[in-house]
Amino acid sequence: MLFRSWATTNPQRRARVMFEFKRLIERDMNTLAEILSSEHGKVIADSKGDIQRGLEVIEFACGIPHMLKGEYTEGAGPGIDIMSMRQPLGVAAGITPFNFPGMIPMWMFGIAIATGNTFLLKPSEKDPTVPVRLAELMMEAGAPSGVLNVVHGDKTARSEEHTSELQSH
């Protein structure tokens, strides 16, 4: 099962994938902005801003190994020690709106993937090309196939289909 494989991948290895993903987005910034502009209608400067604001969350995700350490408090009370562990949850999902097709998907999947979860993304049917390209870049960065999954279709049909599917797991 892919989730278990990705969840048990060393956090530093997952961070390296995120660093490479960040580098690839920076490399392809102009192309992504042109795609977003032509498909959505935003001017290039706004399109670059959309991508850049999503990239800022990816930059944060690159430092995830430090955040995954958990905590230990000895002597929190008489005979009480406290230990917290952070573990991946499983499959996360996001249905994104049309207005920020680069930023919002990265806000959703960046942290989820960096912390060892897999992600199911349903972008808006009005402008899905940038999210699809982001998934391709994630694979190019070294994430195994299936870590970031993109599905398409009418929002009503897809929402009902995947909501019931996710609830059954």
Q: Which residue ranges define each predicted feature?
A:
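Short, small-residue-biased leader/transition segments that mark boundaries at the very start
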Residues: M1-L2, H162-S168
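ATP/adenylate-binding site constellation spanning eukaryotic-like Ser/Thr protein kinases
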Residues: P11, L89, S168
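Rossmann-like NAD(P) dinucleotide-binding subdomain of oxidoreductase/dehydrogenase enzymes
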Residues: G70-S164
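Glycine-rich loop-to-alpha-helix module at the N-terminal edge of alpha/beta enzyme cores
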Residues: F3-L68
